[in-house]
Regions:
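Domain-level signal for soluble alpha/beta catalytic cores
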Residues: 1-233
């Protein structure tokens, strides 16, 4: 939905196929790995007030999922900031036969709440309607993730987190733009790994990094996990 305002909507399918071809090349070079087909938020990220109705979002996500499904191992719904957007995305993703992971973005100062203000725990009702195969929290500050994971764990699914490296993203409900934020300079690879190992201690088995968490962070996290005796699939 961000290509259309730029007059690039006709490239939607081709751009997906180009990205999918490149990720298959990367996996072949690495010799291992799962390919997750990403489906992000509709409208502006971090603006749950701009979420389209469920029937609209479900159709848009189904279109995307059908493009991705033949080329990926799983569908990853990510940076979801409201219960209704989760409903639409899950319905769309389930139009394919691929496993579906649902990842939500939480408030930076209260990881028990989605950016909409709705409780993370309320995902239980959404998942009862349309199931997922795993649940995660992403694209929020690492400081918020422990609380988010505590709310996700009782859902009874594999769970995890991949935080961002942004400054606090404050609620914003004016106009149609995204809230202001910037990259942090205090989130070193060592500090990010400290957070991530705490998530593992909570039982999380799906760990990674989102925006502004780069290769150096992931490389150091890999080393720390190995050193702690964890197996990395």
């Amino acid at each position: 939905d961000r290509l259309a305002p730029q007059g690039l909507d006709a490239l939607y399918h081709a751009l997906h196929l180009r990205a999918l071809a490149e990720v298959h090349e990367a996996r072949a070079a690495a010799g291992r790995g799962l390919i997750a087909g990403s489906m992000g938020p509709l409208g502006e990220s971090y603006r749950p007030d701009l979420t389209p109705p469920v029937e609209v979002s479900a159709a848009l996500y189904a279109e995307k999922a059908r493009i991705l499904a033949p080329h990926v191992d799983l569908i990853l719904i990510e940076t979801i900031s409201s219960l209704d957007l989760a409903r639409g995305a899950l319905k769309g993703a389930r139009s394919t036969d691929r496993p579906v992971w649902l990842s939500v973005s939480v408030q930076d100062r209260d990881g028990t709440k989605l950016r909409s203000g709705e409780p993370v725990a309320a995902l239980a009702g959404v998942l009862a309607e349309t199931p997922a195969d795993a649940v995660l929290a992403n694209c929020s500050m690492p400081e918020a993730m422990s609380a988010a994971l505590a709310a996700l764990k009782p859902l009874g699914l594999p769970f995890g987190a991949y935080a961002n490296g942004f400054s606090e993203i404050e609620p914003h409900t004016h106009g149609t733009s995204a809230p202001a934020y910037c990259a942090r300079h205090d989130l070193t690879p060592e500090r990010y790994a400290d957070f991530a190992l705490d998530w593992v201690a909570q039982g999380a088995t799906l760990i990674g990094g989102c925006c502004e968490v780069g290769p150096a962070h992931i490389s150091h996290l890999h080393q720390r996990l190995r050193a702690a005796g964890h197996e990395i699939a």
